[in-house]
Amino acid sequence: MTTETRLEADSIGTMEVPAEAYYGVQALRAKQNFPITGTKLHPVFIRNLAQIKKAAAITNNNAGLLPEDKADAIVKACDEVIAGKLAEEFIVDAIQGGAGTSANMNMNEVIANRAGEILGCPKGSYKMVHPNDHVNMAQSTNNVIPTAGKLTVLDLLAPLEKALVRLEKELAKKAEEFDDVITMGRTQLQDAVPIRLGQVFHGYVSMVSRDRKRIEKAHREMYTVNLGGTAVGTAINVSDSYFYKIVPNLEKLTGYPLKQAEDLFDATENLDGFVAVSGVVKTCAVDLSKMCNDLRLMSSGPKTGFGEINLPAKQNGSSIMPGKVNPVIPEVVSQVAFHIVGHDTTITMAAEAGQLELNAFEPVVFCNLFESITTLEKAVDTLSVNCITGITANRKHCKDLMESSAGIATALCPHIGYKASATIAKTAVKTGKSVRELVLEQGIMTEKELEEVLDPYLMTEVGEERKEDEARRKAC
């Protein structure tokens, strides 16, 4: 079956473009030039780029530079793109040369052809609405692409933040549920001193809360845009009316508190804002992976590992070992973290590679940053739903571990000194006897004294909790 085509020309030459396509010659060239990932532009990025084109059409019309009929047609075409109706027309690869020019022209061509069609012109004629003269009026790739990237980051961060709020709540529930479960804390994988399992999970709550707040602060990096600066920040070919109104008009469309950069040269040259956002996303991923390492260790076994907690069984763990269940959810979260660390390195190197008045590597920055945010959001969701909510504690086993450990000898130090306590601990390890047994055998303390010194709850209480507990004891 032969596809009908139309001829389109650009400064490079003439090409045949599918007759029914809304994209044009420049998008088609880009598709042929950049068969890199097979991944197209992120749909949220496409939507935001269309928002910018819509704001530009409104602003240029208000400035008297774009006739009403053309502006209305462009706005209608933009609304269709925003609604996702022309998604298949965006054919360029996510990673492309040219600082995003291919993505910008793909959008310009689609909107021009659809707007022209609304006004009664055939696709490819560009007589009524031209991709450069009308759709791209007062704009440059060098400011619409980074602005679309910032809006997309803001849109993608919102569901990640919601996922983190949910994770924080689920961890808080476990912190409360396990508050009375005493186990042995470990430093450098060696027995240390007793700790409540609830305190362990409360530490995770604080960590996730801190990560969430960092991400909230990262929004500020994305609110400053360089629209109006055109190619290098000098605002060439931009009217005063457009220069001062484009950002407020875009702000109305998006609902974000956007502001035009005070230094448009800086905002056009540098990508440090994206590096900063990537950094906080990476930090969150690293923190969650560390927590997942803990969960895997604490649930290891069930007979020959730590065995302090049970993770919900989600699937068979082996094709050869019957009944084996693996900690698959913590494992996948850690893998996402590794992936994000790699993305962050790419983003860092791409930002560093900019030269003079522009960084040409925004496409790879966006491709990696968008994926980092979306994969982390999904990882956080599955961690909450498929792991944290179903964790249970092996209470008796935790207590046995604590009581059999020589680590509780630390509590003796204020009463019998470090040296004597160390001797008790070494003897306990060597003989297999408990610290409690040895202290009583050697007559170092009475059973009543020892009961108070080795009280696991007193050993794990902090600050005001300890004062309240001591007050209750005296009252009794």
Feature names for model-found ranges:
Residues 1-476:
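Conserved, well-structured ligand/cofactor-binding cores
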